[in-house]
Amino acid sequence: MAAEEGRRLQMKNGEGVGRSGRPRWALWIAALMAGALWWTVHSDAVALMSKACGKDAATTPRAARALRGRFLHITDIHPDPLYVEGSSIAGACHGDPARDASDRAGRFGDAMGGCDAPMDLMNYTLAWVATHLRDEIDFVVWTGDNARHDNDRRQPRTAEQILHMNAQVADQFYELFQQQRDGDTMQGVPVVPSLGNNDVFPHNMFSLGPTLMTRQLQRIWAKFIPEEQRQAFEHDTSFFVEVIPDRLAVISFNTLYFFKSNPLVDNCNDKAQPGHALLLWLGSVLEEMRARNMKVWLSGHVPPIPKNFEGSCYNKLAWWTYEYRDVIIGGLYGHMNVDHFYPADGKAAKKSIKRRGKARTKERNTQEQPLDILDDSVDNLFSGRGAMPLRKEKYMRRLFKDVYCPIAKRLEDKGKQEQSYERYSMVHVAASVIPTFNPGFRVWEYNLTGIDNAVAPAPWTRLVRRAQQILSPLRKKKHGPDRTLPPKKPKHLAAGPGHIPQALTPIRFTQYYADLAEINKDYARELEAGRSHDEAAAAAFRYKIEYTSEDEPYPMESLLVRDYVKLASKLTEDRTAWKTYVRRAFVSSGYRDN
């Protein structure tokens, strides 16, 4: 107790220590030094950024694209320019001779091998999407991690490499999706990126801006960020895009400000914390979206699940999603590589905060929460495991026991089922492109009834001004209500598209995957038949449908919150359904815990 009291007193004077045990001033210096490294970049990286920051697509009037009622969610590519086909998988696929055939790195990677994605895997994936999906989707949600892991001590990552690769991947996404096509008369497909924990240096550590790092990211992503939001982005690396003007937006928020593995984050209660500022920004955006009768998808890299986020950050965000269930459709995230859903209980989060005196305490939130992600270490800047899956079956068993089983028990009370549905919001965690398992991504379909894409977007002047005031470090902090807590949803507002069938309600999805074992065999067979390497790759590489939301053994009528809550309950009762769910969670790779 004395030690904790001393820590609180030190924090009051700005001299606290982070959870790594290092002095807080040392952590801030480390962050500043990392930012300085990002400023000193190779001329090639600068050239990439200059290319990326050329003509702003938003400055030229263009015809609206016909809506298709579909969008793409893709995440965690982790391209590795050091990857060498045929080298040792045990050596991170970085050029060491393979010990035997089982240790030989395939051209497109090997599921569960632990290596990052070959550049060919990224390039062929995007080429496949361009051929088969690009003209059939309305927007792209792209949730981060665009650099390799720091999994090779002989070749540690540098800030320059991370910056260069982020710029390169951003260019590819822009040219594939958002750049004007059809003679510069037709709008491209909007792309909404978000920041991953491996997109920063050192990984996981990221402070509130403006910093050299946030400015560099703004330059790289300028073509994706609406011009009026770019100044605020330099503070919180968060923004939103009207993917359907005046009807639907995607909010990209920086989950690293809530992330337990960020040593600069302690909670979301103290005004000096980055998560506190981000919640103020998010609240203002949601308030304006409600005023305009718009709906939103939340998106970010790290999924908001307990112990993935700091306790107060998780509870506050879950409460916001509950009180804004008329606005928020759901959340789209990456990071964990496991294809699954997590129902966030907003009412439970609200009760937890109220029990703690409306979150005004400065003590660390030590509430026991289920589902520690098990994978991240605050202190280890070196990520020795890389893409290797670890204890994922154990994670799924805990998801079953700690989350899905209590839902099933709650649904036993037939009289309270409707209330049980509305208390939840859905956290959708996506499969990744990196071959932690097999590469995968998802195409969502949604209701287009009554939606017109030809509406001109209205200006966001009031909201932008408000956001700048919130994030300004010079703004005088006034005492008053805690605005990181949401207001109660007005009773006259019905629940939104995530809960009640209406325009923009998600109705089905298709999960695509690349079976790497099959692809690598076909590639070898094509080479043996005398084809060139590129001809063999073109013939062998493909994505195919792994499953859809309508497939047995647990077909879903639609993708409302109630459908997911019912599915969580069904999975606890039907052994066949659960086994299929776990197999799909690991992207049909056959993964088992060692």
Swiss-Prot record:
Query: Topological domain, Cytoplasmic: which ranges?
Result: 1-24
Instruction: Output the GO biological process annotations, alphabetical, semicolon-separated.
Output: polyphosphate catabolic process
Regions of this protein lying in the Vacuolar compartment: 44-594
Entry cofactors:
a divalent metal cation
Gene Ontology terms for molecular function: endopolyphosphatase activity; exopolyphosphatase activity
Question: In what way is this protein post-translationally modified?
Answer: Processing by proteases in the vacuole may be required for activation.
Q: Where are the stretches annotated Disordered?
A: 1-20, 475-497
Q: Where in the cell is it found?
A: Vacuole membrane
User: What is the protein name for this chain?
Assistant: Endopolyphosphatase
Q: What is the species of this protein?
A: Eremothecium gossypii (strain ATCC 10895 / CBS 109.51 / FGSC 9923 / NRRL Y-1056) (Yeast)
Name the gene for this chain. PPN1
